[in-house]
Design a protein with these regions (language model features):
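Ordered, amphipathic secondary-structure segments that act as subunit-interaction surfaces
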Residues: 71, 75-79, 86-88
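A short acidic, glycine-rich active-site loop
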Residues: 56-71
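A short helix-to-beta-strand connector/capping loop
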Residues: 83-91, 213-218
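Gly/Ser-rich helix-loop-strand patches that form or flank binding pockets
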Residues: 14, 18, 92, 100-150, ...
Length: 280
């Protein structure tokens, strides 16, 4: 039995992320671990503002901390009740140290991480993606399913194929981890430069492999800039599609300078993204 971990902010529980995690665990009959990142340094209130601007009393600070504990407890309880109602194999972890380090460590011992794209564990307003999301996608030791704000039943698979081994690896991991979704139609999208032909990279091998797994497949080759053409092509897609892509395992400096395809898609579409890269 494979193990899925679903990460949650107990102070701001993502209902959508919970639904995706429970649905997948139920369909695939996997063990589900709810990882509640109860980072001691993260609260629902800004201590600096309270202490230095409002002059908060110890009594008020204690009350606010207790309210946070109650929120986290209720979020965990809700997850537990949902899992019980679906008769899932599950357990719950409460990780109390630095959230990003705790989560990356959890991914070493997981087959799949399910995570809301809106998580930040920060009081500061951040441009999308948050630092928390960026570092998780870079350092995760298992594939990541990044979920949108709204839950939608998956009806179609879209695979972004750039001809590189990383993208093929992502598709292999998808087929390995989510076999119940292989009955859905898949659209393979590849974007080439204006100087190149319209042949799918390694077309014969790709089509041969796809047909071993998916019942219905379609192949689309576009020309132009990958980010631009992919976004334009996906405008017609609904939120019921799931996109598979290989995450570029670039340096952290490179990630800050140039957005990845995952960032581009998350900014423009409300679709779940299955992201995988080969760890080294």
């Amino acid at each position: 039995m494979k193990k899925i971990i679903a990460a949650f902010d107990g102070l701001n529980l993502s209902e959508s992320n919970m639904k995706y995690a429970i649905q997948i665990s139920e369909k695939e009959k996997y063990h589900l671990t709810g990882v509640f990142l109860d980072d001691r340094t993260y609260t629902s209130f800004k201590i600096y503002d309270l202490v230095f601007q409002e002059g908060v009393s110890e009594e008020k600070l204690s009350r606010l901390k207790h309210e946070d504990q109650t929120k986290r407890k209720n979020a965990s309880l809700k997850f537990e009740q949902e899992c019980i109602s679906k008769k899932l194999n599950f357990n719950i972890h409460h990780d109390k140290n630095y959230a990003i380090k705790e989560l990356i460590h959890e991914t070493i011992f997981a087959d799949l991480l399910i995570l809301s794209r809106n998580e930040s564990f920060s009081h500061h307003t951040e441009t999308f993606p948050s630092r928390f999301i960026t570092e998780t996608l870079i350092d995760a030791q298992c594939p990541v399913l990044m979920t949108p704000e709204t839950y939608t039943e998956i009806e179609k698979i879209i695979f972004l194929f750039d001809g590189h081994p990383n993208s093929i690896y992502a598709l292999k991991m998808f087929a390995y981890l989510l076999p119940s979704f292989l009955s859905l139609p898949i659209e393979v999208i590849s974007v080439k430069s204006m100087e190149e032909n319209l042949h799918l990279p390694d077309g014969q091998l790709m089509k041969e492999w796809i047909k071993r797994y998916f019942v219905k497949s379609e192949f689309v080759v576009l020309k132009g800039i990958p980010d631009v053409e992919t976004v334009a092509h996906l405008q017609k897609e609904r939120a019921s599609s799931m996109v598979i892509l290989g995450s570029y395992k670039r340096s952290k400096l490179s990630m800050w300078i140039r957005s990845s395809m995952a960032d581009v898609l998350s900014k423009n579409f409300d679709m779940p993204l299955f992201i995988a890269h080969q760890t080294r």
